[in-house]
């Protein structure tokens, strides 16, 4: 896993926040979310859907791609009363 992380780091040429109003999360399967509301790192050539979370999250999720959720979908998945 460490080698993968180093490989990914070497690909990063730009760090920026993901764009849009969505809430960021890492995913493995569509119903496996974590890293919500954390900053993302993005390869310069990519759009925000190819970003990755910069902060630690659940070990099983770490290093997965960051995913943008529109606010309505986020409300459906994570009702924050």
Curated annotation (Swiss-Prot):
Give the location in the cell: Secreted
Q: In which tissues is it expressed?
A: Expressed by the venom gland.
Report which superkingdom the organism of origin falls in: Eukaryota
Sequence positions bearing Arginine amide: 62
Query: What keywords would UniProt list here?
Result: Amidation, Calcium channel impairing toxin, Cleavage on pair of basic residues, Disulfide bond, Ion channel impairing toxin, Knottin, Neurotoxin, Secreted, Toxin, Voltage-gated calcium channel impairing toxin, Voltage-gated sodium channel impairing toxin
- Major localization listed first in the record, in broad terms: secreted
Q: List the disulfide bonds.
A: 18-35, 26-40, 34-53, 42-51
- Propeptide positions: the record gives 1-16, 66-81
Report the family membership: Belongs to the neurotoxin 28 (Litx) family.
The protein depicted here goes by the name U1-sicaritoxin-Li1c
What organism does this protein naturally occur in? Loxosceles intermedia (Brown spider)
């Amino acid at each position: 896993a460490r080698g993968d992380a180093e490989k990914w780091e070497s690909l990063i040429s730009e760090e920026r926040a993901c764009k849009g109003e969505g809430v960021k999360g890492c995913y493995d399967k569509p119903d496996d979310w974590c890293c919500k509301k954390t900053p993302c790192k993005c390869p310069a050539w990519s759009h925000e859907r190819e970003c990755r979370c910069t902060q630690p999250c659940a070990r099983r999720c770490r290093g997965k791609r960051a995913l943008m959720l529109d606010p309505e979908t986020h409300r459906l998945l994570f009702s924050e009363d």
